[in-house]
Curated annotation (Swiss-Prot):
Name of this chain's protein: Serine/threonine-protein kinase PknH
Modified how: Autophosphorylated on threonine and serine residues. Dephosphorylated by PstP.
Encoding gene per record: pknH
Transmembrane segments: 404-424
Family the entry assigns: Belongs to the protein kinase superfamily. Ser/Thr protein kinase family.
Positions of the UniProt region annotated as Disordered: 292-396
Enzymatic reactions: L-seryl-[protein] + ATP = O-phospho-L-seryl-[protein] + ADP + H(+); L-threonyl-[protein] + ATP = O-phospho-L-threonyl-[protein] + ADP + H(+)
Length: 626
């Protein structure tokens, strides 16, 4: 793409020398840039003044970019840094050589079914990794999918779309293209969960197979109506040669109700793979294998073993975690990673003599060796690459200091890739999920008084009467969406979710001067999917409450509570709430899910750490033994 008029090519933006304009959009401009301090080439996205001045967007972008920067998934373009320079927000990303999927489809037409499935499988892997960390993309579309010459696929713009409300996109007039892939719930007041990304991925699958999005219209109003009420199109009826089995895959992925869609993006990808004929399944596996082999660094040469006597030293680095095949949910990640120790007065240690732009920057957590920068022309920012090597494809001036580590990681990924190919070829039958926990078993899942006392460090806590209905006390919270992050089993929080039963107990020491107080509840849903969807929705709401103070009015009395940062991501989340003027009285909220049961716990006292989380974990263990 040529440098457009009024671009900032040739100028400095903080430490970045802006070398080439890659593209413009409603949210800002993207440049190829040289970081003059680190001496590497990156992609820098500069947000518009309207976005940069929006306090809600600023906070959400920082939070989402920080989370997205931790994603360790090869199909996610990593975010290196974020912050602002002279009041303008920016994101620094790896520069990737590739063409966006939208350009590929417009130039060459529909993909073959095996190639379409190979692309969708890679993007599904990126989405599942993000969803496991509690990150929604919110803008899955062909323009945000990069394809290399060897069909390695990347999903870009994590941390940007998630920070932008649908209302803001609409105001800027940039959502019309996005609306072609937006789930019905995003056009209503319904809660939006990670399954909106699955809907969008199904729309992209349809476009890969047929060459056109599911719904085409000249106006936004017609598009909205189609997503809300229009029949789901059948790819096999649009383009000859598409296996009819894809009709059911797209129909479930684009189901109007979120709970009727696939439980994960990987499940959609696996179903798409099953829709292929046997020869095409092998072809799709070959595409995946070739794309990985061509993109990952070559494995290092084997090093001969040392001749010195063996010692009892522990390995210097832990083994790399296994990559989960498409459609298989990964094991939950640890709910909390200890932060680096702060310096004096809570400040992070850093180099002296930092330039003026440094204090507002937000470096991402270390994630292993930084790969050699490649070229980034994503999200519709550049034309398809021309034949022959790019003029920018030169050896970087600074040598990667971690070649052995990167090579070792490449070996692991290549080996895992081979295992995935074998797994796809064998296609094991999915494990049948456990039967839902019966409502009459709920009370047996709660901790008894001795178990509660042991967790809380007390000896005299006693339970009250069993709770079998939601709390409908006339409580007013200044931020209604934060009520669930403050209290357990609230009727306004669970209303309309489809839950079927609740059982709970409140325990404390006798009298009004108790030092410990616990409210534990278990809530049954018709299916495990509905229970997980509720926890995901709750996690999104809780995270929006982090760092905020709410005023609570209860029986003519007013209280103020401040929320700490939310720890963990579904299936388990926790947050500590501190009551203002209560001499250190705090409560920890914990929510988890196992099978069709949501575990909802509130533990309060003067020395609260992770008691609610411990209680929730013990209840989850009981659910899993049912």
């Amino acid at each position: 793409m040529s440098d457009a008029q009024d671009s900032r090519v040739g100028s400095m933006f903080g430490p970045y020398h802006l070398k080439r304009l890659l593209g413009r959009g409603g949210m800002g401009e993207v440049y190829e840039a040289e970081h003059t301090v680190k001496e590497w080439t990156v992609a820098v996205k500069l947000m518009t003044a309207e976005f940069s001045k929006d306090p809600v967007f600023r906070e959400r972008m920082k939070r989402e970019a920080r989370i997205a920067g931790r994603l360790q998934e090869p199909h996610v373009v990593p975010i290196h840094d974020y912050g602002e320079v002279d009041g303008q927000m920016f994101l620094e990303m790896r520069l990737v050589e590739g063409t966006d999927l939208d350009s590929v489809l417009k130039r060459f037409g529909p993909l073959t079914p095996p190639r379409a499935v190979a692309i969708i499988t890679q993007i599904a892997s990126a989405l599942d990794a993000a969803h496991a960390d509690g990150v929604m993309h919110r803008d899955v579309k062909p323009q945000n999918i990069l394809i290399t010459r060897d069909d390695f696929a990347y999903l870009v713009d994590f941390g940007i779309a998630s920070a932008t409300t649908d209302e803001k996109l609409t105001q800027l007039g940039t959502a019309v293209g996005t609306w072609k892939y937006m789930a019905p719930e995003r056009f209503s007041n319904d809660e939006v969960t990670y399954r909106a990304d699955i809907y969008a991925l199904a729309c992209v699958l349809h476009e890969c197979l047929t060459g056109a999005p599911p719904y085409r219209a000249d106006s936004a109003g017609t598009l909205v109506s189609s997503h809300l009420m229009g029949p789901i199109p059948q790819p096999s009826a649009i383009r000859p040669g598409i296996p009819k089995a894809f009709d059911a895959v797209v129909a479930r992925g684009m189901a109007k109700k979120p709970e009727d869609r696939y439980a994960s993006a990987g499940d959609l990808a696996l179903a798409a793979h099953e829709a292929l004929s046997d020869p095409d399944q092998d072809h799709a596996a070959d595409i995946l294998r070739r794309s990985q082999e061509s993109t990952l660094p070559a494995p290092p040469k084997p090093v001969p073993p040392p001749t010195m006597p063996a010692t009892a030293m522990a390995p210097r680095q832990p083994p790399a975690p296994p990559v989960t095949p498409p459609g298989v949910q990964p094991a939950p990640k640890p709910s909390y990673t200890p932060p680096a120790q702060p310096g004096p007065a809570g400040q992070r240690p850093g180099p002296t003599g930092q330039p003026s732009w440094a204090p507002n920057s937000g470096p991402m957590p270390a994630s292993g060796p930084t790969p050699t920068p490649q070229y980034y022309q994503g999200g519709g920012w550049g034309a398809p690459p021309s034949g022959g090597p790019s003029p920018w494809a030169q050896t970087p001036r600074k040598t990667n200091p971690w070649p052995l580590v990167a090579g070792a990681a490449a070996v692991v990924l290549v080996l895992v890739l081979g295992a995935i190919g074998i797994w796809i070829a064998i296609r094991p039958k999915p494990v049948q999920p456990p039967q839902p926990v019966a409502e009459e078993r709920l009370s047996a899942l709660l901790l008894n008084s001795s178990e509660v006392n042991a967790v809380m460090g007390s000896s005299s806590m006693q339970p009250g009467k069993p709770i079998t209905s939601m709390d409908s006390s006339p409580v007013t919270v200044s931020l209604p969406d934060c009520q669930g992050a403050l209290y357990t089993s609230q009727d306004p929080v669970y209303a309309g979710t489809g839950y079927t039963a609740i059982n709970g107990l409140i325990s404390s020491e006798p009298g009004d001067n108790y030092e410990h107080w616990v409210n534990q509840a278990v809530v049954a849903f018709p299916t495990a999917d509905k229970a997980r969807a509720f926890v995901q929705t709750s996690a999104d709401k809780w995270k929006n409450c982090a760092g905020k103070t709410v005023t609570v009015t209860n029986k003519a009395k007013t209280y103020r509570w401040t929320f700490a940062d939310v720890k963990g991501s579904p299936p388990t989340i926790t947050v500590i709430d501190t009551q203002e003027g209560a001499e250190g009285w705090e409560c920890q909220r914990a929510m988890s899910v196992a099978n069709n049961v949501v575990v909802d716990v509130n533990a309060c006292g003067y020395q609260i750490t992770n008691q609610a989380g411990q209680i929730a974990a013990k209840i989850v263990d009981k659910v899993n033994k049912e």
